[in-house]
Amino acid sequence: MLQDIMNTKKIKLHDCHFGSPLCDPSPAPHLLSSAAAAGLSFHPGLVSSAAQHQQHGAGGWLHEEYYAPRSSPPSSLLAQTCVGSNATAFYAAENLPQFDFPALGTAAAAAAKAPFRSSESELYRPVDPLLLRADHSVRTYYVRPQKRDSGERTPLPPPSQQQHQDRIHGLFAGAPTTRLLSGEPKIHSFPPQVAAKPILPAMDAPSLQNQMENQLTRNCIGAATPVTPTGNLAGSGAPSKTRIRWTQDLHERFVDCVNQLGGADKATPKGILKLMNSDGLTIYHIKSHLQKYRIAKYMPASSEGKQLEKRATGNDMQNLDPKTGMQITEALRVQLDVQRRLHEQLEIQRNLQLRIEEQGKRLQKMFEDQLKASRSVMEPQELDDVVAFAAGDGDDDAFDDVDVQLLAVAGSGYDDAGFQSKIS
């Protein structure tokens, strides 16, 4: 009875995680009886994982490790983990490789043997393969299936060496015109330097492709337009200009040719070029120099004179010998010394002038102070004279009053004696 319950849990867990067509979601009695009759022993990790899945729900990662005895071979271990009639059907249903490699195999070798998933299984992640350890133990990981995003693409398998050679073969083979007109070349022909190498580096392929495409473009233009040595097409434009130096002799020859052709107004660049017949001169040089010659000829006399003076001064400076240059330098140094001394004398004179003005202000102030002092001395004497004169006038008035009083007394005495006084 306990074995039947374990088998039922094993079938349910296996169908929930991997959707195997070998297991029926509804535990039928005949399947349980057939499994029990076959005497299949189930992986204990699956039973414990199923219990953990029922305990925590569908939101956890299931992880169980089972270490088999060292005596049991890997084939027996793999047979115990299978559900079905044989191991081949289980591997085909779960898209797992046949674990027939040595015990010390790597994950890369197992992944290389694994078949590529179809579009029907894109909703689930592939189950990690069972890796055999050195001690003949099996480690099994059960991962919860997750739905992929709609925009996520299925990873492509790594390209093999044959595919890489075919791609390089299609990239460099055939003539350029055949590749341009008819698409993919039919005949594979490599240059000698390319044929020497079995596999070309991937980094060199774009540059070689660009070179071949450029050569194809040049060939498609046609043989009627030859390519010039400068790299430009003959009909696309003028070649690059070269600069020359117009020496005095060359300029004199140019002026003679211009005069022979009737002057700067009537002379043409082609006629001047034919008359000069000088190597290295082109029509562009003649045109440029003729334009400058015309501008210099019709310029005003003043500007022309200034240019002549500048040229003469420059020529004189160039023709000076070192001794004359030293003399001129010494004269300039003496002139600077004289100017410096003159400037110092002017500063001294300015300081003296300021001192003289300040001394004049002081003298003016002293004169004003002396005048004020003299006025203050003369004013008290005048006041004394005025006071003395005023005192003399007061004494005369007093004597007159006394006389008047005496006469009044005398008059009153005569009145008392019986005489009428006529004094008023």
From Swiss-Prot:
GO terms for biological process: brassinosteroid biosynthetic process; brassinosteroid mediated signaling pathway; cellular response to phosphate starvation; negative regulation of unidimensional cell growth; positive regulation of DNA-templated transcription; regulation of leaf development; regulation of phosphate transport; response to nitrate. Disruption phenotype: Compact plants with reduced leaf inclination associated with shorter lamina joint length due to smaller adaxial and abaxial sclerenchyma cells. Repressed nitrate induction of phosphate (Pi) starvation-induced (PSI) genes leading to an impaired Pi uptake activity. Lower accumulation of ILI4/BU1 and BC1 in lamina joint cells. Reduced levels of brassinolide (BL) content. Strongly reduced biomass associated with leaf senescence symptoms and lower Pi concentration under Pi starvation in plants lacking both RLI1 and PHR2. Its main location: nucleus. Pfam families: Myb_CC_LHEQLE (PF14379), Myb_DNA-binding (PF00249). It comes from the Eukaryota. GO terms for molecular function: DNA-binding transcription factor activity; protein homodimerization activity; sequence-specific DNA binding. A motif (LHEQLE) lies at residues 342-347. It is found in: Nucleus. Induction: Highly expressed in the adaxial and abaxial cells of lamina joint under Pi-sufficient conditions. Strongly induced by nitrate via PHR2-mediated transcription activation. Mostly expressed in roots and leaves blades and, to a lower extent, in leaves sheaths, culms and panicles. Localized in leaves lamina joints. SUPFAM superfamilies: Homeodomain-like. GO terms for cellular component: nucleus. Keywords: Activator, Brassinosteroid biosynthesis, Brassinosteroid signaling pathway, Coiled coil, DNA-binding, Lipid biosynthesis, Lipid metabolism, Nucleus, Steroid biosynthesis, Transcription, Transcription regulation. Residues 326-391 form a coiled coil. Residues 144-165 are annotated as: Disordered. Residues 238-298 form the HTH myb-type domain. Residues 269-294 bind DNA. Belongs to the MYB-CC family. Transcription factor binding to specific DNA sequences of target genes promoters, such as the motif R1BS 5'-NAKATNCN-3' and the motif P1BS 5'-GNATATNC-3' to trigger their expression. Nitrate-induced component involved in modulating phosphate (Pi) response and homeostasis together with PHR2; activates directly the expression of Pi starvation-induced (PSI) genes upon nitrate disponibility, thus triggering the nitrate-induced phosphate response (NIPR) promoting Pi uptake activity. NCBIfam families: myb_SHAQKYF. Interacts with SPX1 and SPX2 in the nucleus; these interactions prevent binding to the promoters of target genes, thus regulating negatively leaf inclination in response to phosphate (Pi) starvation. This is Myb family transcription factor RLI1. It comes from Oryza sativa subsp. japonica (Rice).
